[in-house]
Amino acid sequence: MKAPVRVAVTGAAGQIGYALLFRIASGEMLGKDQPVILQLLELSNEKAQAALKGVMMELEDCAFPLLAGMVGTDDAEVAFKDIDVALLVGARPRGPGMERKDLLLENAKIFTAQGAALNKVAKRDVKVLVVGNPANTNAYIAMESAPDLNPKNFTAMLRLDHNRALSQLSLKLGKPVGGIEKLVVWGNHSPTMYPDYRFATSDGASIGDAINDQEWNAGTFIPTVGKRGAAIIEARGLSSAASAANAAIDHVRDWVLGSNGKWVTMGVPSDGSYGIPEGVIFGFPVTTENGQYTLVKDLPIDDFSQKYIDKTLAELEEERSGVSHLLG
């Protein structure tokens, strides 16, 4: 049996946490031969800690052979001690009448503290996925607050946008989603992100040629993917939790176990590619192998695409400048 991998999950008793933990414990994220120890962080209030205890009781009651241990805590340094993987799910949701900039600042406090705790106690090669919104900027804050860790350890989740775009293409084409490759989602995990199927194929055939409808692309596809989260809230009365958890599992699984040459979208610190300033956490196409990701380089960017990339970058730059004073 392999040595257990330590996985931290923040916001562990929340909706996404609840949809995530049982799948991690069953081996869906790191492999069916990989034991895990779950290190679960929740808010210190009585209600959150009681809910966390209940989730841990349920995890016990599943008798997962791969679940080698659990820790439940309200202390980030306990939750992040010696961890291999961190899923930072917990974030301050936007309350009624709350300005976006206030939300940014509230979350900046959380992710500054969590970045510092990771810096202090996590393994040096820890893989960090930020799910809590605004994910790109929260990941940037955590990364900047952990100066002793490699910036490449920090990623933001754009896999939900990627999966949403895959499914819209599958519906449009009437073809199975599993045959679609080389889709890209550029930018911020927000309605400004740009799903781009110019390079995508379905069973090897060009999707751009098959659809060949720029009006559908600009008027239906891009806005449908961008506003999908809001559409789910309207329909369900709650934000997307199971699909977000599923995307987190996809992201970490591919990062750790490899994407087998397939392109996937990850929010990663830019190395200056595609004109994105260095250090900005931006959705890019990557391939993954041996626990490392590699940017897909030198894709041509046409004028239509550049306009969308510029727009999502401008939003990220604005978010970054809104919190920069907190990062020294």
Curated annotation (Swiss-Prot):
NCBIfam families: MalateDH-SF1 (TIGR01759), PRK05442.1 (NF003916). NAD(+) binds at residues 11-17, 107, 114, 131-133. Belongs to the LDH/MDH superfamily. MDH type 2 family. Keywords: NAD, Oxidoreductase, Tricarboxylic acid cycle. It catalyses: (S)-malate + NAD(+) = oxaloacetate + NADH + H(+). The active site is at 189 (proton acceptor). It is an enzyme of class 1 (oxidoreductase). This is Malate dehydrogenase. Substrate binds at residues 94, 100, 133, 164. GO terms for molecular function: L-malate dehydrogenase (NAD+) activity. Catalyzes the reversible oxidation of malate to oxaloacetate. It comes from Xanthomonas campestris pv. campestris (strain B100). Its EC number is 1.1.1.37.
